[in-house]
Amino acid sequence: MFDLSLNFIRKVKRNLFPFYKNKELKFVFKTLQQGYPDNIVAARFVGGCVRKYLLNDVIDDIDIATILNTNEIKEKFKNSNFKVIDTGIKHGTVTLVSENFKLELTTLRKDVETDGRYAEVEYINDWKLDSERRDFTINAIYLDVNGKIYDPQSGVLDLKNNNVKFIGNPETRIQEDYLRIIRLLRFAIQYNSSNDQRTINALKSNLNGIKKISKERIFNELMKMLSLKNFYNILKHNNKKNIFLLIFPELKHFHRLEKLNKINKFLKIDQYTLLSILLIDETDNLEYFSFKYNIPNDIKKKT
């Protein structure tokens, strides 16, 4: 009952006070738009913030796609209240930081060459082309500062139907960045999505590519997955559970998860405790996993 009330409150708040009407955000978009005619859109929100806005979820990070390059962005905000940080110049990304916001701005781009881990990119001003290089349709929904949706990959419909799917050919998307295998699992669990056999086959046939990904990126993605409120949904999908265990064979004690699921609503179990539950046994399983993924000492103390 409480969850329904909370969701209703968020929905009312979204309709009456949408996040994009915030004065600071409007200033950012007005600044980016300066020098361009009204028929050219200089910037749009994209990714998680748009997805969460449409689902009435709490927005905890904001990504902005723009036709401006990083030098142009820095020039426009050099005398503003925002501090500009070079967080990913090589990939066209800077971060604007103020007292209230941390905004990641990335120039529209397309991949020229990929190796399964990193991509060489070319900067563009074509919104549809930019959408085609993204991972999932639900992450390629754009929103302008006036609340108008641009949805070239039909992500809104997929989001409504809890359908997490790759843009275009699953094999191609995965081979651009093998971390997308784990990301697909995370989003599919989060939205309780049933994926088609073509996608499942693509995940399985490309598992070896995960070896190309840094251990830190893999572990960070795992912790995001374990922090999901509905991580237990993985128990409903044998295909996803089996793929998860192929990637993380040390997290093998799923029988414990099945028992926990029965009382989960009465417990508050964080991702570190959950990691421990799936790992710890009478062997050196935990120690091996910690070594394998270079787990920092502060996290080791929590497990």
Predicted stretch roles:
Residues 1-303:
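Catalytic cores of the polymerase beta-like nucleotidyltransferase superfamily
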